């Protein structure tokens, strides 16, 4: 439940960011101070983090990564599409396909990072763990033989 609450809270922050009108209110004045290029590319880490939170939330519910990752990535993309459509209905804001593409780039980067971490753990950590366990078993066997003598 905690992971779901964190993901929903984060989605609320992303939604709030989509409906801020530049120049109106305190948050709008802050938004007007941010350079345009930075604001455009801020979608990538925002939706990448959302995909990560959703994936981890599904994994906490015992979903394997092979199922959790595409479902979470799809949900993050649909949420990005929904916020872009809604943003277009807010006066002073506009929808932009480029923002949706940047959302997808962020989701793709997050998915790649999660998959590479899984592959790295299987390649690097698994052999090290197997070697440690085999040495531990040999050490246990040696100590057992010494005790019997």
Where are the regions that the model predicts?
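Hydrophobic alpha-helical transmembrane segments
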Residues: 4-8, 45, 69-74, 100-104
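Interfacial helix-loop-helix junctions of multi-pass membrane proteins
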Residues: 24-31, 80-108
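Membrane interface segments of multi-pass transport proteins and intramembrane proteases
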Residues: 31-36, 59-67, 123-130
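Short, highly charged, low-complexity non-transmembrane loops/tails of multi-pass membrane proteins
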Residues: 125-145
């Amino acid at each position: 439940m905690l992971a779901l609450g964190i993901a929903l809270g984060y989605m609320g922050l992303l939604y709030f960011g989509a409906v801020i009108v530049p120049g109106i209110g305190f948050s709008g004045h802050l938004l007007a101070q941010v350079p345009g290029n930075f604001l455009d590319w801020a979608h990538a880490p925002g939706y990448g983090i959302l995909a990560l939170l959703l994936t981890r939330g599904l994994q906490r519910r015992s979903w394997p990564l092979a199922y959790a990752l595409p479902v979470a990535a799809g949900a993050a993309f649909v949420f990005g599409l929904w916020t872009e459509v809604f943003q277009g209905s807010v006066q002073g804001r506009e929808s932009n396909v480029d923002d949706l593409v940047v959302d997808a780039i962020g989701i793709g980067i997050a998915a790649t990072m999660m998959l590479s971490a899984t592959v790295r753990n299987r390649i690097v950590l698994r052999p090290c763990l197997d070697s440690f366990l085999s040495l531990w078993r040999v050490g246990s066997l040696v100590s057992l033989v010494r005790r019997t003598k």
